[in-house]
């Protein structure tokens, strides 16, 4: 099969970017022929995907003179918000991406187009290629964009209804797609997500044992400093260093644990394109009474080492689907703390019921991803309690998450009978 994948963002740094990259890698292992259209900022190095023909679209260029469009209002890199697009910017976006897509379709002659995000570019592609088989992937941030502002709303809804198939990570997103876009439920399939089993696994050498699950004995920080395992419980956060990923609440909750005499260290992997918010994170961390290590944005192979070193992965997001990082952490032997996002507990109960996942209850949110200031203490106490439960849990036997592999997911896409 000849498959053309399409993404308006960078093929890295975010969940959808990693999702795209892993599909490309696994379709290549399946010997499918592939091409890909994606966005990059001017001057960035062109990524190389083995066996895949690339059609990059350059932002911050003469034809597209603004930063990469982001499906979140705050991206881990410099970005433009969809709600800030003017008519001229919208036309520049349409022209730049459809030019690349038309070139890819003409040269590559795909049998199937895979469009990431049920949003603007996917709508444009559906309109431009009415006779092509097009599948759309919901990554949850598209739902948030549709509910937060009205950019091309009716146009997007109409074109999403015309997609041949839509994939959602879990039932909560399927229900939202039906509600927001009015799509026929028979064309929506819960496909879960996957993780890279070759990269994310328990350490195989230089092991350290606290419970029954081996941990990595030591790790090198980006600055070259070596950190060794000891008495402290090592917490890891990987994601955008922003409020809506729960970073401020995590810092305060961890501080309360330290005040109670719990020995902890916190490792923060990620960045924030919003400099003001990033500085606020660093400012709050300066007052911490426990060690905090800022790791910056890490390549996947480097992040894998920190999963193997840490004991508990914590991601108290205000809004998300199924975080890829949570699966990677579980596969690497971590206990995991997440917020009670819609349908998330049911997802883990269905796919890996023995996984050591602990939940911090979210209060009622405003506009899907905003928390009232008066609700923060409640949420942070819940994070503290969930981390404490994870710390006290005797993890003796690795949970099996092998069914959630990218290879399995790719076979489902190609083989319709698997759905």
Model-based region annotation:
Residues 41-100:
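A conserved catalytic-core segment of Leloir-type glycosyltransferases
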Residues 278-298:
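Nucleotide-activated donor-binding/catalytic signature segment of Leloir-type glycosyltransferases, i.e.
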């Amino acid at each position: 099969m000849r498959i053309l994948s399409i993404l308006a963002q960078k093929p890295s740094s975010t969940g959808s970017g990693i999702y795209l990259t892993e599909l490309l890698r696994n379709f290549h292992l399946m010997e499918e022929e592939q091409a890909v259209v994606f966005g990059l900022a001017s001057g960035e190095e062109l990524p190389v995907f083995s066996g895949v023909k690339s059609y990059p679209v350059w932002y911050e260029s003469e034809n597209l003179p603004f930063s990469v469009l982001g499906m979140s209002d705050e991206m881990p890199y410099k970005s433009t918000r969809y709600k800030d697009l003017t008519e001229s910017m919208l036309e520049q976006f349409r022209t730049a991406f459809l030019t690349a897509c038309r070139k890819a379709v003409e040269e590559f002659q795909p049998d199937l187009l895979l469009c990431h995000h049920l949003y603007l570019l996917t709508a444009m592609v559906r309109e431009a290629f009415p006779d092509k088989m097009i599948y759309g992937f919901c990554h949850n941030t598209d739902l948030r964009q549709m509910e937060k502002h009205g950019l091309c709303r009716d146009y997007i809804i109409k074109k999403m209804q015309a997609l041949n198939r839509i994939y959602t990570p879990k039932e909560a997103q399927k229900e939202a797609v039906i509600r927001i876009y009015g799509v026929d439920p028979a064309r929506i399939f819960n496909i879960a997500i996957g993780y890279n089993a070759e990269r994310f696994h328990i350490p195989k050498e230089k092991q350290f044992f606290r419970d029954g699950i081996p941990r990595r004995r030591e790790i090198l920080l980006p600055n070259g400093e070596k950190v060794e395992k000891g008495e402290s419980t090592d917490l890891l956060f990987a994601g955008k260093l922003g409020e809506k990923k729960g970073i401020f609440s995590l810092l305060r909750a961890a501080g309360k644990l330290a005040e109670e005499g719990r020995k902890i260290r916190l490792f923060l992997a990620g960045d924030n394109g919003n400099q003001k918010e990033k500085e606020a994170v660093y400012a709050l961390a300066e007052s911490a009474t426990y060690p905090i290590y800022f790791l910056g944005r890490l390549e996947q192979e480097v992040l894998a080492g920190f999963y193997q070193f840490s004991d508990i992965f914590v991601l108290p997001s205000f809004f998300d689907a199924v975080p890829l990082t949570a699966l990677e952490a579980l596969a690497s032997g971590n206990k995991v703390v997440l917020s009670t996002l819609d349908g998330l507990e049911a997802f883990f109960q269905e796919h890996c019921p023995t996984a050591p996942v602990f939940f911090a209850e979210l209060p009622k949110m405003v506009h899907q991803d905003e928390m009232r200031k008066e609700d923060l203490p409640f949420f942070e106490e819940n994070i503290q309690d969930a981390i404490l439960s994870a710390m006290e849990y005797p993890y003796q036997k690795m949970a099996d998450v092998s069914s959630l592999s990218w290879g399995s997911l790719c076979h489902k896409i190609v083989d319709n009978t698997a759905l």
